[in-house]
Structures are given as C-alpha cells and as structure tokens.
Amino acid sequence: MAASMFYGRQLAAAALRSHRPQTTLRAAAQVLGNSGLFNKHGLQVQQQQQRTLSLHEYLSMELLQEAGVSVPKGFVAKSSDEAYAIAKKLGSKDVVIKAQVLAGGRGKGTFTSGLKGGVKIVFSPEEAKAVSSQMIGQKLITKQTGEKGRICNQVLVCERKYPRREYYFAITMERSFQGPVLIGSAQGGVNIEDVAAENPEAIVKEPIDIVEGIKKEQAVTLAQKMGFPSNIVDSAAENMIKLYNLFLKYDATMVEINPMVEDSDGKVLCMDAKINFDSNSAYRQKKIFDLQDWSQEDERDKEAANADINYIGLDGSIGCLVNGAGLAMATMDIIKLHGGTPANFLDVGGGATVQQVTEAFKLITSDKKVQAILVNIFGGIMRCDVIAQGIVMAVKDLEIRIPVVVRLQGTRVDDAKALIADSGLKILACDDLDEAAKMVVKLSEIVTLAKEAHVDVKFQLPI
C-alpha cells in the first residue's frame, strides 16, 4: 500500500501529537534510512501502517518489573498527599517526580500552573508534595501536545539513581528485517533522532529470527557493540532478552528504553520505558487494553476507535472521507497540489456501514476548522450506494451547511448517484478526482473568506 512522501511526514507528525505509533524510534528509523546506513548493509526502512496503544510510563515499568527487568523502585501517586507518603516510604535523600502524560518532551514542558518541567528532582517528602501539587490536575504543554496540552492525573515517584553511563535500547518490528530488530546506542538519555542525524554510526542493530527467537549470543554481541563494560555485558544481555520476551508476550510493536544505564553500583537498570501495543491484538490482550487512558486522547480519537474508523486530525480546512489508506493519502496530496490543506486523514475501510459513514461525518464536522468536505470512494468491496446512503443521512441529520463534494467510482456507482440526486440535498457530484479536488479547494476558500467577512454564504449549486 503506497504512502505519499509528503503526507507520510505529515501523518508522522500528527501521530506524535495524538500518541499513535509514530515514535522517536520511527523518526530515527526515517533519518537512518535517509542517511544511507541501512543501504550500506543491504537493508531498507519501511513505514508500516498500524494503530497502536501507548501506556503511561508507570504502567510500562510495572510490566518490566513483572518480566524480571531491573528498574528503579517507584510508585504512582494520584494526589500530592500520596506523593508525600511515597517519598517518605522510599526513604531516599532525593527522589524523582515524573509527570504521567502521554507526550514526549516532558522535561522541557510547562504546566498550566506555571511549573516548568515534567520531571523534577526533589530532596524531601515536603518538596515532593509541593511539586506534585503543581503537576496533578494541571495540563502539561510540550512541543508534541501543542497549545492544548495534556492533563496530568498522576505522577511517578521513584528513587533517584546516579548513572555512570547511559545507553539507548529498543525493539521494534521492521518489515525489511522480516521480523523484530534490536536497536542500541552508546548515546542514551538524549533524542535518538539527533543521534541518528548527526552520528548514524553510533546506532547498532541486531535482527532477530522470529521463528528461532533471540539467542543469548545476539544479546551479548549487541551489548558489546553498545559499549557496556565487560563485567556487566551479561547483565545487560539478560535484560535485553527479558525485554524481548515481554515484546512478544504482549504483542508489542515497540519497546523503547531511554536510558538503559549502568548505575553507580555497577548494576544495569532501565530508567524509562515506552511500550506500544498492536491494536489488532486487543482481543487477546484485554488486560493491557483495559489500561488505556482516554483522558490523554483527543475525544475524536476515542469516537473513531469506537466506530472502527482510522482517523488522524490535521491542521487544514478540507475534511476528507476516503476508503483505503493509500487512496486517502493520494487524495490529501491532490488537495495540497491544488492549494488546499487537508483537515484530517480518514479511512472508513473496505466494509463500511451506513452508520460508520455517518459517524465519519460527525468526526469531520466536529472540527470547526473544516470549511468543505471531499468524499472520494473507489468501490470494490465497498459499495458506492452504501456510502451514498451514509452521506445523505449525515447531511440531513447533522444539518451540514458547508460544501460537500463527492467523487464516487466502482460498485453500484449509478445507484449511488441516483440516491444523491433524489435526496434534493446540495451535494456536489464529480466523476474526476482532479476536478473534485479543484472544486473543494475553491469552495473552502470561498467559505473561509465569507466567514472572515462575516458574510453568510448559502450554496445553491446544481448537482
């Protein structure tokens, strides 16, 4: 399924904002691919379309503990009083308070309370209480969240460790390797994108045979390449093997440890964990998927998931409803080609029902930036008349007052056109995709200009 270069990048950025599968690791993979490092070894980086679940750090750390992976001692607090009690219980001179928000860049973020930084070192239970009170119940604004920010409902209170060295370690599924791959670097605790861009040779990898599984010598080899001292190579390898087993057990698409460290006592610890899970495994990973925190998601993401619709919000003014991810991105590109900006990626899939089409329109029109809508359907498995029924129902029920341009081709297209024509609604039909894109761009510009001038524009255009 081909993905356009332009909107591959746009969707990656949007996925980061909505905490979908595009992570720092995938961004690094893209940079690595561009660097020529993979080509040098006869490998290719391929982006894979997946819907994934991300969990809070404290939940990921609990999974690591259950798997026998070495992690710092810590507990989650949902109030400042709980943070005080945990800090006292840990009995350490200093502890770390980490805001539990599903967004990268926490350390450089700012809370609506005015507190700067979502990761703080404190030196007493009293200070733990004071700092956590400025985090819990407040929104953390980072580069990834945008101005809206994300609510912080709890904090992780954990013991502070003093690392001698920091490393980066991750496991991901990569099609070009035909299975999982371990990725490591001696440069941990920093943005892996920067490492990949500035020093790609610092990143090492070890493909794993999905049938044979991970071998200890593979983990040992990677640990050595990452620069672990000889006296703790075996310990690092053991943690990598346990992480790989966790990766398989829970149908993860990515496990990222940044940093994995050698602490002042010479022990290997995983200081931070990000785990993404394949949403296709929800039926057999109920324990994991019941942990999803919907307060961290855009309300439209939740509605889309409930309706089984692939949706990602963008920043444009033209709503898109398409069947098939490849056609959806091609549609977005042709809108951009003619000077428009898509407001979303929306794929209703090959077997959409009338209800799903209606739900798709609800998602699109809930975005107040949308000034016009383009429906582009190529009916193979998907019947055009079903789409048409959904369009007519949605336009009526939602009282849509912005232009709707429809381009239908394929199965039962004549029945679909008849349904639209007989509806009496001002839905604009167009057989040619290029013409449909030009039309929706012009109409969105007219609506935008009219709203800016406080003019009420009514579209009385023939079908």
Curated annotation (Swiss-Prot):
ATP binds at K98, G105, R106, G107. SUPFAM superfamilies: Glutathione synthetase ATP-binding domain-like (SSF56059), Succinyl-CoA synthetase domains (SSF52210). It is an enzyme of class 6 (ligase). Its main location: mitochondrion. Coiled coil: none annotated. Residues 61-288 form the ATP-grasp domain. Mg(2+) binds at N258, D272. One of its GO terms (biological process) is succinyl-CoA metabolic process. Pathway: Carbohydrate metabolism; tricarboxylic acid cycle; succinate from succinyl-CoA (ligase route): step 1/1. The modification Phosphothreonine is found at T341. The modification N6-acetyllysine is found at K78, K88, K129, K139, K143, K216, K368, K438. Its cofactor is Mg(2+). One of its GO terms (cellular component) is myelin sheath. Binds 1 Mg(2+) ion per subunit. Its EC number is 6.2.1.5. It comes from the Eukaryota. InterPro entries: ATP-grasp, ATP-grasp_succ-CoA_synth-type, ATP_grasp_subdomain_1, Succ-CoA_synthase_bsu_CS, SUCC_ACL_C, Succ_CoA_betaA_euk, Succ_CoA_ligase-like_bsu, Succinyl-CoA_synth-like. GO terms for molecular function: ATP binding; magnesium ion binding; succinate-CoA ligase (ADP-forming) activity; succinate-CoA ligase activity. The record marks D94, Y162 as: Important for substrate specificity. The modification N6-succinyllysine is found at K88. Residues 1-53 form a transit peptide. ATP-specific succinyl-CoA synthetase functions in the citric acid cycle (TCA), coupling the hydrolysis of succinyl-CoA to the synthesis of ATP and thus represents the only step of substrate-level phosphorylation in the TCA. The beta subunit provides nucleotide specificity of the enzyme and binds the substrate succinate, while the binding sites for coenzyme A and phosphate are found in the alpha subunit. Belongs to the succinate/malate CoA ligase beta subunit family. ATP-specific subunit beta subfamily. This is Succinate--CoA ligase [ADP-forming] subunit beta, mitochondrial. It comes from Mus musculus.
